[in-house]
Amino acid sequence: PAAQEPAAVAAAAAPSDSGRPAPKGAAVVSAARPWQPPPIRGQISAQYLSVNGRDSLTSDLTQPAFYVRLDGHNLGGSPLGLLLDARTRMTTTQPVGGTVSTQDNVTRVYLGALLYNAPGSSLRLTLGRQYSPVISSVSYFDGLLAEVVKAGWSVGVLGGLQPDPATLKFSTDIQEGGLYFQLHNRPASTTNWSFTLGGIGSYTQGQPNREFAFLQGTYNSRALSLFAVQELDFYRGDKAALGEPPVSPTNSLVNLSLRVTDAVTLSAGFDDRRNVRLYRDIVTPLTQFDDAFRTGAWGGAAVLVARRLRFGADVHSTLKDPTTQGNIYSAYFSTDRFSPLHLNIRARSSRYDNNQMAGWLHSGTLGVSPTPWVQVEANVGTRNDERSTSSLGLNHVTWYGASVDLSVARAWFLNFSFTREDGTIGKNDQAYGMITFRF
């Protein structure tokens, strides 16, 4: 809602809308100013992770971390803005059986850029550490992105340097440049869609590091949601001399969701991307399992009953990697804000069978939100290998834990969680806390 100024009481006569002086002592209400968003929005977060090993295989670890994100536009009424996403952490590890701990201090800047976009202008400039929100194939780079954005189309050109892939520190080893052209829906359209075509080239000491073209499409309506990207790599120079074909399709990703009726939804997808950068505050056996079997093709269906109960099943086939080729069959159930306590229940059961291993994974979560600003969850899970070619043998692991989320005054957010893991190849207790201020 629009913020209003308090009414001002005039001690003397003041002009009224009719032009006549208002009676002495009459209240004059000043005009309400339209609400304006603050020029800079963002969040500041402090986090702490502790892992305590309870066997001879797991090291102890402590990791305090700090995170800041800023997003500013039209600073001081100017066409300038800024983006900042920086994270720092200090990791202390106590090796198993060791008396000397090791410490690793890391500070990484994921975004650090100046923006230029004059009101009413179609030209947008971004200078600094960034990634392209339009081109999913482009990772971080230090340089300039120039875009012209019109009602039904846009075009962009970028150039700069790739940071060190391991540390994200500034580096001049790899130079990068590219361009794209995009057709998209007009602002008043009820359906969001886009089609993007472009090419990117990166070079090391004048030699090709990677050259590729890409096609990317998105479509979102009430019934259909689609995201698809296909990259096409070109090989020449040293890579061609090593026997690579001149042109090769690489890095395909498709995500499709079709709402057949209000109660039935179908989903399908395909992912053979080689490298995906993942961000995890907490790693559990469940996230490790899903990350390990990310690639492949999948399809499934979900049914909504009584607007609160969701039942679903899917099958995931890992087709590309012969070492993990096989299938994962999953069934799941969930509820959303069920009963006056706003119960949230999620349960999942997965059967996996591939060239390396076979077994079962089960997990469940029970959450309750007694108030809009408090949420409490408890979780439990187990994974049991029936067959494995790993040198560590069969993996049998169980885990359970709890978390609490608190929201204070719509600006402060607190999260606390604890997880205990008991497995044949590792036992540990994991505690995590976070406090975030949003403005």
Language-model segments: residues:
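Gram-negative and organellar
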Residues: A3-F439
